[in-house]
C-alpha cells in the first residue's frame, strides 16, 4: 500500500483518546446495554425453568438437552476472546497456518461423538477423572488428573481469555483493566452459579449467534475496504512497515516482511513456523486431549438427551469450526494491510508507542479493526461479541472446574456430603476461581503479548499428550491397568514440565531477540515435542501394564471399545469403596424432607430459589423412577432413521475437512 493510504490510519491510532471516544455514543452504548440485559434474561429464564437442585441437574442439565444448543455451546466454549485476539494476531504476523488448528477439530469432533462419548455414557460418569477411576480402580489417577486440569484451567484458559479481553476493552473503552475484568467476571459468575450447566448452554447459544452475526459483518466490511479476496492476497504480501531502522540499528528482513508461505497451511517440516508433520500428527494429539478428554467439552456432550443428539451436536460444532479461518484469521491479516505501521511494527520503541509492548502489536489487529472500521452501533455489537466470547469461555471453565472439584476432590474430603452440600461446594469453588483469576491478572498483563498464543499451545504440548495417551489406551487396549496408566502419566508429566520450566527460564525469545535456551532442549518445535512425549507415554504405559497383573474382563464390560456391546453383568472395580454420594447421605436427605419442617422466611426462600437449593419442590422419585433415571443416564441407543442421518452428516463433515486442508495446503 502507498503511504497516503496508510497515513490516515496511523494518525488516527497514534493517540488512544480518539479510540476511547469512538465507542462513547448513544448507538454503541445502547447495543451493549441491550446485550447485557438479554444475556441476564436468558440466564434468569434458565434459572427458573431448569432443575438445578441435583448433581445431575446442575452439572449435566439432567441429560435433557437437544443437539443445537449443545453444538453452539461447544463452539462458544472453544472460541474465547483469545481466539479473536490470538488467531487474528497470528494471522497478521504469519498468515493462514493457524487456521489449520481450527480445521483439525473437524475430525476430532467426529471421534468424540462416535467413539469416546458412547463409552463415557455407558460408564455413567460426570467427570473425566471419574471415568479413569472406574476404568482402572484406585483414586490416585482421578485426583492427579483433577488437580492438573484445574491448574491448566487457571494458568492457561482463564489467564488467556482475561488477558485477551483486557486488550480489547482497554483499547475500545479506556476503562481500567481491573474494573472491566471485575465487572465481566461478576456477571459471568452470577449466571453460572445460579443457573448451572443448562444456563451456561442456553447463554452460550445466544452468544454464538451474536458472535457469528458480528463477525460476519466485520469480515464483510474488512474485505470491502481492502478490495476483495484477490486484492487481499496481493496487498498482504506487500504490507511492510516503513520504519525498520533506528540510528545504527536495522531490523532483520524476516522480522517484518510477510512469509512467502503465508497462504499455505502446510509448511516446511524443518524451517516452517508451523511444520506440516506437527500440524497433522502433533496437533491431532493435542486435539485428542482437548476435544475428547477435556471436561469443558465432554460435559456438554454428556448433557445430550440421547446418542443421536450427541452426534448431531458434534457435527454442528464441526461445521462452525470452519468459520474462524475466514472470520478471525483473515480479518487479522486485513488489519495488517490497513494499519501496517501499527500492526506490523518491528522497532521496540514504535511498538511501545502503538500498543504499550515492545515485542510487537499483532495482538491488537482484531480490536483495531473493530474500533477503526465499524460504524456506530455495529462497533457496540462487536464489543458485545468480544465480551460474549470472553464470558462464554469463562462460564464453561467455571462450571466444569466446579464439577471437577466437587465430584473428584470434595467428595474425597467429605465422603458423606449431602446433595445440597455438594451443590453449595461447587458454587463456592467458582468464587475461589474468580479470586485466583483476578490475582493472576498482573502476571498475564506482564507477559509478552506477542507470545501469548504460542504460550497457550506450548503449555498444552508439554502437559496434554500423557493425558491423551492414557484415555486412548484406556478405551482401545483393555490390557492397560492402573499401574501402567499412573506411571505413564507421572513420567510424561516430569518430561513435559522439565521442558516447560527450562524454556520459560531462558525466555521464549522473539525474532528480534532469539532465546538463549539450548537447542537440544528448546530447538524441537512444540508440536514435534508433543509427538515425542505422546510416544514415550504410550510405551511406558504399555510396558508397565504388560509387566503387571491385568484387569479381569468382568470389571471392563462396556468400558472398553472391544467390550462395548457386552450384555454381561459388570462388577465395578470401586464397588467395595464408598461412592461419591453415599447411600446414607441420600437417606439423610430423604429423612429430613419427611420430618416436619419449620416455615422458611422470605429471605431464605429467595436464597434457595436463587441458588437452586430448593429440593422440596416437587414429589420425590420412587425407587422405580430412580432406576429409570439411571437407565436414561447410561442409555446409548438410537433410532435407526436418526442414526443414519447423523452418520451421513459425520461422513460429509470428514470430507469437508479433507477438502479444506487440500485446497489451502
Curated annotation (Swiss-Prot):
Residues 48-66, 118-139, 194-202, 296-309, 407-422, 478-481, 548-645 are cytoplasmic. GO terms for molecular function: D-glucose transmembrane transporter activity; D-glucose:sodium symporter activity; galactose:sodium symporter activity; water transmembrane transporter activity. D-glucose binds at residue 457. It catalyses: D-glucose(out) + 2 Na(+)(out) = D-glucose(in) + 2 Na(+)(in); D-galactose(out) + 2 Na(+)(out) = D-galactose(in) + 2 Na(+)(in). PROSITE patterns: NA_SOLUT_SYMP_1, NA_SOLUT_SYMP_2, NA_SOLUT_SYMP_3. Disulfide bonds join 255-511, 255-611, 345-351, 355-361, 517-522. The modification Phosphoserine is found at residue 585. InterPro entries: Na/Glc_symporter_sf, Na/solute_symporter, Na/solute_symporter_CS. N-glycosylation is not necessary for the cotransporter function. Glycans are attached at residue 248. It is a multi-pass membrane protein. Its main location: membrane. The record marks 43, 300 as: Implicated in sodium coupling. The cholesterol-binding site is formed by transmembrane helices TM1, TM7 and TM13. Belongs to the sodium:solute symporter (SSF) (TC 2.A.21) family. This is Sodium/glucose cotransporter 1. It comes from Mus musculus.
Amino acid at each position: 500500500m502507498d503511504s497516503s493510504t496508510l497515513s490516515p490510519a496511523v494518525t488516527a491510532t497514534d493517540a488512544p483518546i480518539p479510540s476511547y471516544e469512538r465507542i462513547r455514543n448513544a448507538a454503541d452504548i445502547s447495543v451493549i446495554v441491550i446485550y447485557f440485559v438479554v444475556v441476564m434474561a436468558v440466564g434468569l429464564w434458565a434459572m427458573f425453568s431448569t432443575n438445578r437442585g441435583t448433581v445431575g441437574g446442575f452439572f449435566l442439565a439432567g441429560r435433557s438437552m437437544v443437539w443445537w444448543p449443545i453444538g453452539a455451546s461447544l463452539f462458544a466454549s472453544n472460541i474465547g476472546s483469545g481466539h479473536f485476539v490470538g488467531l487474528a494476531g497470528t494471522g497478521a504476523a504469519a498468515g493462514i497456518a493457524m487456521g489449520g488448528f481450527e480445521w483439525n477439530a473437524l475430525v476430532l469432533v467426529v471421534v468424540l461423538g462416535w467413539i469416546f462419548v458412547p463409552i463415557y455414557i455407558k460408564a455413567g460418569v460426570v467427570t473425566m477423572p471419574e471415568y479413569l477411576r472406574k476404568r482402572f480402580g484406585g483414586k490416585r489417577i482421578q485426583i492427579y488428573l483433577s488437580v492438573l486440569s484445574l491448574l491448566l484451567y487457571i494458568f492457561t484458559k482463564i489467564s488467556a481469555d482475561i488477558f485477551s479481553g483486557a486488550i480489547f476493552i482497554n483499547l475500545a473503552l479506556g476503562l481500567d483493566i481491573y474494573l472491566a475484568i471485575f465487572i465481566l467476571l461478576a456477571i459471568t459468575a452470577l449466571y453460572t452459579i445460579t443457573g448451572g450447566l443448562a444456563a451456561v448452554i442456553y447463554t452460550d447459544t445466544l452468544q454464538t449467534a451474536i458472535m457469528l452475526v458480528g463477525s460476519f459483518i466485520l469480515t464483510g466490511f474488512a474485505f470491502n475496504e481492502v478490495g476483495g479476496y484477490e486484492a487481499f492476497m496481493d496487498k498482504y504480501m506487500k504490507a511492510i512497515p516503513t520504519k525498520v531502522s533506528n540510528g545504527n540499528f536495522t531490523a532483520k528482513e524476516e522480522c517484518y516482511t510477510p512469509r512467502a508461505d503465508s497462504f499455505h497451511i502446510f509448511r516446511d517440516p524443518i524451517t516452517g513456523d508451523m511444520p506440516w508433520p506437527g500440524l497433522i500428527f502433533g496437533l491431532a494429539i493435542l486435539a485428542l486431549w482437548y476435544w475428547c478428554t477435556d471436561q469443558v467439552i465432554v460435559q456438554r456432550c454428556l448433557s445430550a438427551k440421547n446418542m443421536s443428539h450427541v452426534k448431531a451436536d458434534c457435527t454442528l460444532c464441526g461445521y462452525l469450526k470452519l468459520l474462524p479461518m475466514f472470520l478471525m484469521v483473515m480479518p487479522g491479516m486485513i488489519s495488517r494491510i490497513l494499519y501496517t505501521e501499527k500492526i506490523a511494527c518491528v522497532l521496540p520503541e514504535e511498538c511501545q508507542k502503538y500498543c504499550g509492548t515492545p515485542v510487537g502489536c499483532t495482538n491488537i489487529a482484531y480490536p483495531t479493526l473493530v474500533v477503526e472500521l465499524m460504524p456506530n452501533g455495529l462497533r457496540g455489537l462487536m464489543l458485545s461479541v468480544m465480551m460474549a466470547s470472553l464470558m462464554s469461555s469463562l462460564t464453561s471453565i467455571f462450571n466444569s472446574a466446579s464439577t471437577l472439584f466437587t465430584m473428584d476432590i470434595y467428595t474425597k474430603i467429605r465422603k458423606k456430603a449431602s446433595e445440597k452440600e455438594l451443590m453449595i461446594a461447587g458454587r463456592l469453588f467458582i468464587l475461589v476461581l474468580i479470586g485466583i483469576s483476578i490475582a493472576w491478572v498482573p502476571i498475564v498483563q506482564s507477559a509478552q503479548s506477542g507470545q501469548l498464543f504460542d504460550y497457550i499451545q506450548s503449555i498444552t504440548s508439554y502437559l496434554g499428550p500423557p493425558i491423551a495417551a492414557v484415555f486412548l489406551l484406556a478405551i482401545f487396549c483393555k490390557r492397560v491397568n492402573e499401574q501402567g496408566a499412573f506411571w505413564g502419566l507421572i513420567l510424561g508429566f516430569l518430561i513435559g514440565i522439565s521442558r516447560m520450566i527450562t524454556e520459560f527460564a531462558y525466555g521464549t525469545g522473539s525474532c528480534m531477540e532469539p532465546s538463549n535456551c539450548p537447542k537440544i532442549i528448546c530447538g524441537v518445535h512444540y508440536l514435534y515435542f508433543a509427538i515425542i512425549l505422546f510416544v514415550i507415554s504410550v510405551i511406558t504405559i504399555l510396558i508397565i501394564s504388560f509387566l503387571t497383573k491385568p484387569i479381569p474382563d468382568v470389571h471392563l464390560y462396556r468400558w472398553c471399545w472391544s467390550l462395548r456391546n457386552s450384555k454381561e453383568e459388570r462388577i465395578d472395580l470401586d464397588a467395595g469403596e464408598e461412592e461419591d454420594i453415599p447411600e446414607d447421605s441420600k437417606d439423610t436427605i430423604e429423612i429430613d424432607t419427611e420430618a416436619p419442617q419449620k416455615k422458611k422466611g422470605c429471605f431464605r426462600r429467595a436464597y434457595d430459589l436463587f441458588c437452586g437449593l430448593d429440593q422440596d419442590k416437587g414429589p420425590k422419585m420412587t425407587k422405580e423412577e430412580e432406576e429409570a433415571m439411571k437407565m436414561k443416564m447410561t442409555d446409548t441407543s438410537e433410532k435407526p432413521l436418526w442414526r443414519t442421518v447423523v452418520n451421513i452428516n459425520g461422513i460429509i463433515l470428514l470430507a469437508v475437512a479433507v477438502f479444506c486442508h487440500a485446497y489451502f495446503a
